[in-house]
């Protein structure tokens, strides 16, 4: 399977890194590595995580405060968003 980070998800990652990195650069890097690690594992087990709140999506709790939303389309896994758990989605 092919893994694709959609533009909004990449933008989310940058904003999260900037926000956390302002106070704790090391924590920001560790969290971003966790996003990358979870995403990289998806092609092996794409349906491992729970169905999302939006039909056709799945959600990974990467950290108690952050959820990664993805969708599977054919042979492609699209990372759609990386959101704070308290954020309203959709």
What is each model feature region?
Residues 1-2, 90:
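Absolute protein N-terminus
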Residues 36, 64-67:
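Σ70-family region 2.3-2.4 aromatic/basic alpha-helix that recognizes the −10 promoter
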Residues 46-47, 58, 81, 87:
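Flexible, active-site-adjacent loop/turn segments at secondary-structure boundaries
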Residues 2-57, 73-76:
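Basic, Lys/Arg-enriched alpha-helical interface segments
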Residues 66-67, 71-90:
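Enriched for short, Lys/Arg-rich terminal
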Residues 57-63:
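A beta-hairpin/wing motif
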């Amino acid at each position: 399977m092919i893994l694709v980070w959609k533009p909004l998800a990449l933008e989310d990652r940058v904003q999260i890194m900037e926000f956390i990195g302002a106070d704790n650069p090391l924590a920001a890097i560790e969290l971003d590595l966790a996003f990358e690690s979870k995403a990289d594992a998806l092609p092996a087990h794409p349906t491992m995580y729970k169905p999302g709140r939006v039909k056709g999506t799945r959600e990974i709790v990467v950290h108690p405060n952050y959820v990664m939303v993805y969708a599977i389309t054919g042979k492609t896994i699209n990372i759609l968003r990386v959101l704070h758990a308290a954020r309203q989605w959709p």
